[in-house]
Amino acid sequence: MAVPKRRMSRANTRSRRAQWKAEKTELVGVTVAGQRHKVPRRLLKAARLGLIDLDRR
């Protein structure tokens, strides 16, 4: 594992960390039992198989 040679200042550390941003999950439309729902892509198959309750929010 890489070890820093010198201590990094608090300002530099925080400005570096501020560059990272979380991305919103992309929602995909799916029709289940005649109703249209928007779910994340990773839950698409589970929604089609009825493994998750889409009516509960």
Swiss-Prot record:
Q: Name one GO molecular function term.
A: structural constituent of ribosome
- Give the residue ranges for region: Disordered: 1-20
State if Ribosomal protein is listed as a keyword: yes
> Basic residues: which segments have biased composition?
1-19
Q: Please name the GO terms of the biological process aspect recorded for this protein, alphabetically.
A: translation
UniProt keywords, alphabetically: Ribonucleoprotein, Ribosomal protein
KW Ribonucleoprotein (keyword) present:
yes
The record's Pfam families line, in alphabetical order, gives: Ribosomal_L32p
One GO cellular component term noted in the UniProt record for this chain: large ribosomal subunit
Q: Its family?
A: Belongs to the bacterial ribosomal protein bL32 family.
NCBIfam families in alphabetical order: rpmF_bact
Protein name per UniProt: Large ribosomal subunit protein bL32
Gene assigned in the entry:
rpmF
